[in-house]
């Protein structure tokens, strides 16, 4: 109760606590304030695993709508809800950080799509420069016909000018993943990318989420992420 739960059966211990960082705002477009809260889970080891949880206001009662794992011992500085999205300002572990001491400044954005809380955007500040992936076309929720092209831009080109991409259905089913090349004047300079998709052979219609990711070559973590949400006909 009171935002905390724990159990100890003599062999195993487990506790979960709602942290004192949260936000109120409309997440589903019904004009009523919902909530975003941060939960920390402790299974008795050294880890402290945090998640962001979307909570709908359903006829005045809180109903958990979706949850996304943030990681072990990340530091959530602030939570905000605007434009039906959850925005987090956090410190995550960089490649050389011990788990106890995160120092990588990130901003993360989450959307509730169907019944899943999706990470839609991540930016990181590395060496004083912000790594961002901006989708320039098409617009979010746009109707597209196979084949369709997604374009984007980055202010700082990734290692070897390579971005990964992942295609998902709104229920979390992964359709495909691969990589693409960024066109730029060299690593660390601004760049652009363009990728054409054709999902007709997979028989996929309806909404799909395509995530473009800059991956750390040091530890495989996400440095930047940009997403396109399109309705495929």
Segment roles from a protein language model:
Residues 16, 132-233:
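Ser/Thr-rich low-complexity repeats and stalk/linker segments
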Residues 63-72, 120-124, 177-179:
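Beta-propeller fold detector
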Residues 18-29, 77-84:
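Beta-propeller blade termini
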């Amino acid at each position: 109760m009171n935002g905390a739960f724990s159990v100890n059966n003599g062999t195993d211990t487990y506790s979960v606590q709602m942290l004192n960082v949260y936000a109120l705002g409309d997440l589903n477009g019904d004009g009523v304030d919902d909530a975003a809260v941060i939960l920390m889970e402790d299974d008795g080891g050294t880890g402290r695993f945090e998640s962001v949880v979307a909570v709908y206001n359903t006829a005045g009662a809180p109903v958990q709508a979706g949850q996304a794992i943030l990681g072990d011992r990340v530091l959530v500085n602030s939570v905000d809800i605007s434009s039906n999205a959850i925005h987090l300002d956090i410190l995550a572990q960089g490649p050389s950080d011990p788990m106890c001491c995160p120092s990588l400044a990130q901003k993360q954005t989450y959307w509730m799509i169907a019944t899943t809380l999706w990470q839609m955007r991540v930016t990181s500040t590395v060496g004083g420069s912000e790594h961002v992936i901006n989708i320039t076309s098409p617009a979010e929720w746009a109707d597209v016909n196979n084949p369709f092209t997604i374009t984007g831009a980055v202010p700082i080109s990734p290692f070897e000018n390579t971005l990964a991409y992942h295609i998902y259905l709104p229920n979390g089913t992964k359709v495909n993943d691969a990589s693409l090349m960024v066109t730029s004047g060299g690593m660390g300079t601004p760049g652009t990318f363009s990728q054409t998709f054709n999902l007709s052979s997979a028989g996929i219609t309806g909404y799909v989420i395509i995530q473009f990711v800059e991956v750390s070559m040091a530890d495989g973590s996400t440095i930047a992420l940009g997403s396109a949400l399109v309705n495929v006909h």
